[in-house]
């Protein structure tokens, strides 16, 4: 089983959006038996909170299924159990390197690196641009799917 873990600052905007977008792509490809997807936070700030309402609205508008959830923090077990750990920006990467003691198993990447681009998924919590975040996330998730399934 390929285990993909998306990580962002608080686990209420970008990483849950990526989780639900990726789950939708995996389901539409009929690959649920091969790929599991989850998300978590690199910080404690939003632990216990559900996906941010504007993200839920956008997912609903796009026809992407989502569930009620609670933000959770990245753990050492996440590192051991995940095949790919995918952050959204350089801050996430720094946090993940710190939390994994330098990523010795080379599991950490940034989402848009999968598309060949060297840029971040901007945090819509600050930009209020959920549509652009969605487009970047969808593009990155599609590239991941192509990259992990031969």
Please give the residue ranges for each predicted region.
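Conserved active-site segments centered on acidic
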Residues: 1-81, 146-150
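Phosphate-binding/catalytic loops
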Residues: 84, 90-150
